[in-house]
Amino acid sequence: MAVKHKVVSLPRLNRLSPTLESTALKLMEEAGELAQAIGKLRGLSGEVCYEDTRAVMEKVTRELLDVAQTAVSMMFVLEEDYGINIEAALEEHIRKLRAKGYLSL
């Protein structure tokens, strides 16, 4: 079976001056908003969800893309401010997934 890929190409935000710390905090904030959207659908907050599933899934999608954008912003910070090679790190990440048995190529 061929391995599927989901390619997400998001821009470097050019009207912000992110730092490692500010981006990490923003990532946690966005992840919290994603969890909140999922929790609302599942009734985990104790309140009844009156929105239809499609509307909630669209909100979950928007929040997930906010998480992805912030993660990409952090990648730019790591590359530009700390000299990290994200491509090499990605290759190592794939090797790790294979070693753990999460992925076979």
Task: Show which residues each predicted segment covers.
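Flexible "arm" and connector segments at domain edges
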Residues: 1-105
